[in-house]
Amino acid sequence: MIIKNEWLIVGFITSCHGINGQLKVKSLSDFEERFLKPGMRWLQKESEHPSKIELISGFKQPGKEIFIVKFKGINTRNHAEQLKKCKLLVKSDKLPKLKKEEFHLLELIDLEVKTLENDELKIIGKVINLENEKNNLLIIELFKNQKKVLIPFVKEIVPLVDIKNNFLIINPPNGLLEL
């Protein structure tokens, strides 16, 4: 899940790797350098404030969205075990600049969701969050019944995103909103 505030979750520590304090991180980011390039990062344990930690090195496991990382001061498996399930964060004001017509997934939260019915746009709900495991999914709350539905964020289903005017249009396959 991505939370719209000053932090953006870019990965989760899933497990330890080896005995020298290395960790496996599941990436939620399109920017691999967040896990490869040494420098300061932010970690957050459950129900705690984020804290700084220095990334020393990292590499990507072939064919996976998993990175093996090494943080300064984490030198044993026991130290690494304490960081399992931590979130790897970046400050939302440090997001990379994008080209025109591009946007960060974080910007989709709170957009109105519209469908085209009989040549008319109808507001049916709003994006309340995102889920990003293997594919990006929009979590949409429908206004008619406050039901939450997951919508795949693909061009065929979400043909238009208008950040400037605060809405997106979905073209869901029959039955998707009734699930």
Swiss-Prot record:
Provide this UniProt record's keywords sorted from A to Z: Chaperone, Cytoplasm, Ribosome biogenesis, rRNA processing
Q: Which Pfam families match?
A: PRC_RimM, RimM
Its Gene Ontology molecular function terms? ribosome binding
Localization per Swiss-Prot or TrEMBL: Cytoplasm
Q: What SUPFAM superfamilies would the database entry show?
A: PRC-barrel domain, Translation proteins
Recorded GO CC terms: cytoplasm; ribosome
Known InterPro entries for this protein? PRC_barrel-like_sf, PRC_RimM, RimM, RimM_N, RimM_N_sf, Transl_B-barrel_sf
User: Which coarse location class applies to the principal site listed for this UniProt protein?
Assistant: cytoplasm
PRC barrel domain: residues covered: 100-176
Q: Does the keyword Phosphoprotein apply?
A: no
What Gene Ontology terms for biological process does this UniProt record contain? ribosomal small subunit biogenesis; rRNA processing
Quaternary structure and partners: Binds ribosomal protein uS19.
UniProt domain comment: The PRC barrel domain binds ribosomal protein uS19.
State the similarity comment: Belongs to the RimM family.
- Protein name per UniProt: Ribosome maturation factor RimM
Q: Which organism is it from?
A: Prochlorococcus marinus (strain AS9601)
Taxonomic classification, please? Bacteria, Bacillati, Cyanobacteriota, Cyanophyceae, Synechococcales
